[in-house]
Amino acid sequence: MKIRSQVGMVLNLDKCIGCHTCSVTCKNVWTSREGVEYAWFNNVETKPGQGFPTDWENQEKYKGGWIRKINGKLQPRMGNRAMLLGKIFANPHLPGIDDYYQPFDFDYQNLHTAPEGSKSQPIARPRSLITGERMAKIEKGPNWEDDLGGEFDKLAKDKNFDNIQKAMYSQFENTFMMYLPRLCEHCLNPACVATCPSGAIYKREEDGIVLIDQDKCRGWRMCITGCPYKKIYFNWKSGKSEKCIFCYPRIEAGQPTVCSETCVGRIRYLGVLLYDADAIERAASTENEKDLYQRQLDVFLDPNDPKVIEQAIKDGIPLSVIEAAQQSPVYKMAMEWKLALPLHPEYRTLPMVWYVPPLSPIQSAADAGELGSNGILPDVESLRIPVQYLANLLTAGDTKPVLRALKRMLAMRHYKRAETVDGKVDTRALEEVGLTEAQAQEMYRYLAIANYEDRFVVPSSHRELAREAFPEKNGCGFTFGDGCHGSDTKFNLFNSRRIDAIDVTSKTEPHP
């Protein structure tokens, strides 16, 4: 057993209001520069819908993630090394700019410079930020399907409608929607790392964050196809790939990510999970896709177990990280209460950004008397949001974990309602779903109140154990995301070990 630690995230979809504050703040901090205008490290999608980029969940089209071969071994869906090499100069599974959107701005200056006395009112026409040319029509945007925008025929192409009678959901009275914030999953078994020909993508041991070394990246873009969540973007200005860095400078300082800090609905939780690195391959190679969720739970370790603590210390896990893991809200929601579920575990990447399924539309229908009662709790199998849809999204089609999570949240609400409104303690609903009163009270504190100190338990990192920080702090100045350019000479005042980046954006003079 080799114990490693990972900073994970849980998003409570029951409370997401679709305000896109997380997307805007992330955009302003990380991708508000030339080359990545179309890139959104964090975006909020409306489900059902094809998402961003279009139809990203269709792995038959994009070939992302892993597949299990007949001999039980894993292989990138793109193919083995020889197949990857054959596609390196012409990747047929790479999403194009039209699958995202053509980034644009408007000619606002035309409003100021238009001649006076014109017969028509001046307008600001759209202009492409890539080509600089005017666009006749805006065909798509970063959030084109927001709040069920568009006709149902396009929304029905959502892969999560598999095994569902989706025709009935085209009728207005049966319409449903939910918000799905997405970011890099920082997987335990990342397919992007395996598909990078340059070896530029790596997973940090101390916190599990997956990063792209901008000095090693050569812009092959195989990682974009390899990532099943399509959360790696190509910077056309620098010629390198970029992705969500989980705000690692803030994580190292013990602070939450920007998207978590600015979340209006308090839906994001950050915490440490201890896991057995030796069990990753066995878990990801599970034959039945529906068992992948449980196999990933088996990889996680109990931070309160004395044997786990002893082994973690031997493996170099700092005591502050172990203490943070014992207070982790992510561990409570994923392991203790089993409310949080992974996004598309069938991709076999073992994602580390998990989701609590939405309950609000269900509870509203129950209050209105539209659902029959099954004992104390409403019949959650007759929901407005189909359970099978949530299962296709979160548990590879297995409805049992989804039903358990929904029933436990309903039971907690029933218990607290009886306590606060009726002034009595009614534990029948809790007994039905296997919860204690102490667990229900703690769930209420974390889910409903969601104080800052409960949502974010992030220990400051011990980077001093990894390498000398002085050369790294002083040897690299300001950068605009295209790598750290050092001196042209061999002499380096700061004794930094960084390799100078290759300038792929320099323009050469044309031959006469």
Where are these regions (language model features)?
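Non-ligating segments of multi-cofactor redox enzymes
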Residues: 1-512
